[in-house]
Amino acid sequence: KYSRGRTSQNNKNKIGVIAMNKSMKKSPITTHILDTSTGKPAANVAVKLFVQSNNEWHLIAQGKTDTDGRITDWLDTDVEFATYKMEFDLDSYYQNKEMPAFYPEAQITFRLQDKKHHHIPLLLSPFGYSTYRGS
């Protein structure tokens, strides 16, 4: 049976959660790695993020993917319009899985030209990888 008080209480809790999530700032650049050879996220992959300035690469963040294959929290500031590069340590990832890997690392270079969130997915296997502009 419909209970007005209970429904109001439930809605209030949901609104509080939404407001809390909106106030949390997401990194302007994120990544997600899926291992297509297993059909699962690639956890514990070391990733470095660089920005290019004066024709030199400068390390601005690094981390490891979580159990869902994601890094979402490595930058807490806005980023400048520039060229960026992610380096993914595939050699260590596949060594830990006791699998051979043809590519010891993957590099993805991309250019930011707006203030939108930029999600850079990587689909990988021991003998290939691909990427695309995520959402």
Predicted regions and their residues:
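Feature of secretome-associated and extracellular-like proteins
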Residues: G16, N21-K22, T83-S135
